[in-house]
Amino acid sequence: MQIRPLHDRVIVKRLEEERKTASGIVIPDSAAEKPDQGEIIAVGKGKVGDDGNVRPLEVKVGDKVLFGKYSGQTVKISGEELLVMREEDIMGVVEG
């Protein structure tokens, strides 16, 4: 199953990292905060302005992005947790 975001929404897959303390203890997922980085896997057509014109999104599929801890809505598609959020919830694109 695929999901196609509407308007100025994007679908983001969180980038997971193994969480360890400095002494090497692995922190379980239930105790760790969710990462605030992800990769965009789908984008909507753009934001509709007051004049009725559609402004394309600045982000594109494959971009690595930073977002706030409470950004977006979590959905589960084909057993995978994804985030649906508006482009304005994205704080920046990681380049390089």
UniProtKB/Swiss-Prot annotation:
PROSITE patterns, per the entry: CHAPERONINS_CPN10
This protein's GO CC annotations: cytoplasm
CDD domains listed in its UniProt record: cpn10
Keywords on record: Chaperone, Cytoplasm
Primary localisation category: cytoplasm
Subunit structure: Heptamer of 7 subunits arranged in a ring. Interacts with the chaperonin GroEL.
The protein's name in its UniProt record: Co-chaperonin GroES
Lineage, opening ranks: Bacteria, Pseudomonadati, Pseudomonadota, Betaproteobacteria, Nitrosomonadales
